[in-house]
Amino acid sequence: MSRLQDFYKSKVAPDLQAKFGYKSTMEVPRITKVTLNMGVSEAVADKKVIEHAVSDLTKIAGQKPVVTKTRKAIAGFKIRENYPIGCMVTLRGQRMYEFLDRLVAVALPRVRDFRGISGRAFDGRGNYNIGVKEQIIFPEIEYDKIDALRGLNISITTTAKTDDEAKALLTAFSFPFRN
């Protein structure tokens, strides 16, 4: 069991149950999955770009991502149907907790001019999204070996019913919110 998962079961879950007055431990919000998505629009011109994005995301997540393809052709963007346009990976269980631990403790503090993450990026149903501008904030990515700086979206899906419950959950996991 990872450090963060153990911390959730021993400290976070009982605290949230007391704070929100849940009758059952199954009502307590928990993180169900973390989805990492990297959109690579340059892949239209150069097919090798998608391979670099896949290798970067594999290093970051510790799991091979699936290549996302376009659903329909759009002439204005010069894309055809089934063109590889990005990659995504879904983390659950132990890998998810280990990734979140690395994200909060190592990666986010390495962001340039970091003052905390926005407390307004909740979707109204208890899920949270973080946009990362550069993949080099993760220690697994070596600066000398990357071909271009790429951003990625991190979606944290929880079982929380409201944004307040989700924010309390993520704050308990020591996410550095600025507001």
Swiss-Prot record:
GO cellular-component term (any): ribosome
Name of a matching Pfam family: Ribosomal_L5
Annotated NCBIfam families: PRK00010.1
Family per similarity comment: Belongs to the universal ribosomal protein uL5 family.
InterPro entries in UniProt: Ribosomal_uL5, Ribosomal_uL5_bac-type, Ribosomal_uL5_C, Ribosomal_uL5_CS, Ribosomal_uL5_dom_sf, Ribosomal_uL5_N
Gene Ontology molecular function terms on file: rRNA binding; structural constituent of ribosome; tRNA binding
Gene3D superfamilies assigned: 3.30.1440.10
Protein name: Large ribosomal subunit protein uL5
GO BP term, pick one: translation
Subunit: Part of the 50S ribosomal subunit; part of the 5S rRNA/L5/L18/L25 subcomplex. Contacts the 5S rRNA and the P site tRNA. Forms a bridge to the 30S subunit in the 70S ribosome.
Alphabetical UniProt keywords: Ribonucleoprotein, Ribosomal protein, RNA-binding, rRNA-binding, tRNA-binding
Functional summary from the UniProt entry: This is one of the proteins that bind and probably mediate the attachment of the 5S RNA into the large ribosomal subunit, where it forms part of the central protuberance. In the 70S ribosome it contacts protein S13 of the 30S subunit (bridge B1b), connecting the 2 subunits; this bridge is implicated in subunit movement. Contacts the P site tRNA; the 5S rRNA and some of its associated proteins might help stabilize positioning of ribosome-bound tRNAs.
